[in-house]
Amino acid sequence: MLRKVFIILLISLSFVSCEFILDTEFASSYLNYTIIDAPSEVAQRAFKFAQLYEQEDTVYVWGGQEPLRKAIGIDCSGLVVMCYKYAMVDTVYELLSSDMTAQNIYDRASRRISVSNARKGDLIFIGTEGSNAVTHIGLFEKYENNKVYFIDSSEGKNGVHYSEYQVDNKKIKGYGRMRVKY
């Protein structure tokens, strides 16, 4: 009888475990960390690392997440992930995941903010005009004269570079603040 109860319990846990992991707010209440917005100093440091990738003429490689010293190639989400990883070295903060797509970061690892509240190192989410899907991401620099300035990595410009869009560009899907473990 006890064996049957144990098997039923294991089966029940397997059904709820996937949902448990997807709900980060719920999960953090049971784990030994809290999920918070990345502090301003972390976001600013992340942006400085993006500038280093740009200065090193890092090329675009789809799926790339190369460390700065190696700098073979990096894609847009890899740039964001690596810059935030570097920015959190010797701090009490950690990324929610070490491998995320632009859409994953939009859905699960950031909090929506307005462009007027965006600070250096926050995130800009980009996609195809007419679609809600997020297919590209960059690190926000500033909003000035109706333009948004950011650093990203794209195949079209072959690597990490400074970009700018008009603030009303339909490709912009939103702005976000990275969420981190604390």
Where are these regions (language model features)?
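Low-complexity, Gly/Ser/Thr/Pro-rich intrinsically disordered linker/tail segments
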Residues: 170-182
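N-terminal capping segments
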Residues: 19-94
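Residues that form or immediately flank small-molecule/cofactor binding pockets and catalytic motifs
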Residues: 65, 155, 180
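Sec-dependent N-terminal signal peptides
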Residues: 4-13
